[in-house]
């Protein structure tokens, strides 16, 4: 088996975590991730401006109709989970979904080079971590606004066990809160990072296996790569949906009365 794989190992040159880097204020910056994130943000903003210019109270166009369906789906999820108090969560969850999905689409671009010019920003742990921390901060802000400062702290010491076991309650609830940003980050980062590796490995495998078949080999290589990219794009959409859904559920926990948990 090792001898069979030796030719493939010789042509594969995948370097996970390699980026176009530079220094800024003494900090190491992954510039490819920075500009990919900026481009994704510009795409989302541009889509919003286009939608705003084409919005009408009459018969909606296809673009506006798709947007209204997306908003309606998120609104229903928020209403079912949080109720009317969660109206402000709708734009946050929808924006996160669209932005993450746009970032994830970049993973299907530029496969085959040592350093992709436009990598998926979500395949670098810094962006998922930043978004996860932002979500958690906003969730705690909503909890304080909903329960008040006293109720916010009481929530962590008064349940799930009686108040006399407050230290145990604080420990368990503290662990739960620490785990939330970790799971949000690693779920998104891990899937996109692994997906990028699989795309690179598949491209190398197909090139090695069918590289000597001329035009037929080129066609087969393209077909395999396109099919896997479509599959990976579907995974990217699912991960964006999960991130947005968990955001809604975290707000639900923060904004619900204590007796509901």
Predicted ranges, named:
Residues 1-261:
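Selective transmembrane helix interface/packing segments
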């Amino acid at each position: 088996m090792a001898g069979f794989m030796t030719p493939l190992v010789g042509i594969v040159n995948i370097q996970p975590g390699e980026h176009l880097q530079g220094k800024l204020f003494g900090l190491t910056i992954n510039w490819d991730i920075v500009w990919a994130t900026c481009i994704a943000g510009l795409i989302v903003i541009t889509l919003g401006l286009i939608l705003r210019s084409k919005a009408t109270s009459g018969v909606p166009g296809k673009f506006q109709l798709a947007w209204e369906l997306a908003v309606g789906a998120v609104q229903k999820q928020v209403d079912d989970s949080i109720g009317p108090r969660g109206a402000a969560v709708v734009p946050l969850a929808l924006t996160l979904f669209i932005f993450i999905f746009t970032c994830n689409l970049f993973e299907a671009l530029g496969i085959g080079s040592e350093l992709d010019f436009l990598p998926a920003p979500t395949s670098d742990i810094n962006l998922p971590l930043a978004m996860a921390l932002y979500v958690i901060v906003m969730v705690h802000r909503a909890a304080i606004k909903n329960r008040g400062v006293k109720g916010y702290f009481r929530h962590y010491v008064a349940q799930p066990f009686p108040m006399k076991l407050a230290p145990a309650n604080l420990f368990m609830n503290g662990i739960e809160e620490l785990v939330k940003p970790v799971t949000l980050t690693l779920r998104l980062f891990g899937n996109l990072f692994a997906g990028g590796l699989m795309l690179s490995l598949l491209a190398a495998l197909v090139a090695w296996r069918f590289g000597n078949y001329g035009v037929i080999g080129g066609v087969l290589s393209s077909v395999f790569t396109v099919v896997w990219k479509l599959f990976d794009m579907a995974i990217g959409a699912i991960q964006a949906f999960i991130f947005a859904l968990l955001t809604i559920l975290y707000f639900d926990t923060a904004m619900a009365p204590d007796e509901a948990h």
